[in-house]
Amino acid sequence: MAHKKGGGSTHNGRDSKPKMLGVKKFGGELISAGAIIVRQRGTKFHPGVNVGIGKDHTLFALVDGHVAFTTKGAMNKPTVNVATA
């Protein structure tokens, strides 16, 4: 017989790496075309003027300019715009 109990096993011991989501450029900041403004899951922020959306819902600038956060429509959806400099 063993004089110590077996070590056993566990079902834990793993974790996913951070996804680095969130707002990367804030209102009023000067950005260049192609710069990422928001990384998100789903459309918490919607693309507005001069803003594109990637397949993972990342919002990015289509032109050089200043970032502006507004709300749009009857549902007051948060929208990101880029005003040309």
Curated annotation (Swiss-Prot):
SUPFAM superfamilies: Ribosomal L27 protein-like (SSF110324). One of its GO terms (biological process) is translation. One of its GO terms (cellular component) is cytosolic large ribosomal subunit. PROSITE patterns: RIBOSOMAL_L27. The keyword Ribonucleoprotein applies. InterPro entries: Ribosomal_bL27 (IPR001684), Ribosomal_bL27_CS (IPR018261). The keyword tRNA processing does not apply. It comes from the Bacteria. Residues 1-21 are annotated as: Disordered. Gene3D superfamilies: 2.40.50.100. Keywords: Ribonucleoprotein, Ribosomal protein. One of its GO terms (molecular function) is structural constituent of ribosome. NCBIfam families: L27. Belongs to the bacterial ribosomal protein bL27 family. This is Large ribosomal subunit protein bL27.
